[in-house]
């Protein structure tokens, strides 16, 4: 909840652990230090700040600081003196300089999205607790080799920078599971060729009638719409995603659109009907099949506390049959994507739609905002990327197993799932299976082989 400076000055916030101030501040309010004994989370986003006070470490319990959408041109060095600070968020400033002195010793999560950073300090390699690093929309031309020591790094966003290559050591980080790098010079040509070379229907804007807004994310807004048909046919319900065009924490909307198009058809992906043509404001958009409202997200996104792991509804449980179908469906979809030269980059339960009611057991992988492209024929590179994403899949499988009913009564299946999870999460990257290996293990367990046989027999 946003509070006011007047409330702070009146002493109404004594004892608070979380403070949010967005009052057009150009200077750090000294009254914040009255909360030094309790304040843990400080959010100063959406102000006009360019500096922080030298005595910021007086906030001795401060764990998290947000200062996005301000006027900082450098990451304040005083942050490095805050002994308990683990999360630092300075998105959408004008930051060019990041000093090694600005990195706190317990840094776990650093957000520098949409700034002007050209160089990261070598001291980042000493951030032994670093798990999540958000750098999309900067001017980085290289990464410091010292980052190879960041053995706990799990999620890395590098999209929309100036990188000419991914360093070899990056794909050797033992816990890296979620990577996005689209919109860099070394990958731009692949994304551009998708938009030119991949066949997709063009749908005139005037053939669409927007109805209710279904949702909004960082990259765009999704609407329910009616797609006009020929005069002798009724219009059909569809979903339309109109992209915003600005850089997001994951990357560029144009790259997301290209990935959706390149993904093609698969039973566990949301079908794309076509690309919007002749929008009056020139906006880019996709027309997709409308998903049955019985589908819901499998989980919520990570919290400030969980950092890289999704948050499930309390008490949420899955039957064994559902777990097997989800696990197989997502492995099959990921295998298909990598064959198409697409790495999803955000393979998480919160990006998976799970059916209920008549759709029970059905599963769809969505949200391509962090997707990146690779040449599938470059086996060494593409296999390395795939094994990286297999670790993300292992995290998903671990979460499903933890919430699965019926394992005690199916000891053999339980043993196979636990062993598969362990292989996917192995820090010996070369020993991890590829997605087709995973699908081969799960296909007979999930009954997918029987369904495939039945489908072929019906043809």
Where are these regions (language model features)?
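Catalytic-loop of the protein kinase fold
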Residues: 334, 338-356
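Structural motif at the C-terminus of the N-lobe alphaC helix and the adjacent alphaC-beta4 loop
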Residues: 258-269
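C-lobe/activation-segment region of protein kinase-like
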Residues: 364, 368-419
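Conserved short submotifs of the Hanks-type protein kinase catalytic core
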Residues: 281-295
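Activation segment signature within eukaryotic-like protein kinase domains
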Residues: 326-327
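The feature captures the LRR N-terminal capping module
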Residues: 1-54, 58, 63-77, 81-111, ...
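ATP-binding glycine-rich loop module of kinase domains
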Residues: 220-258
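Short beta-strand micro-motifs within the conserved protein kinase catalytic domain, predominantly
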Residues: 271-284
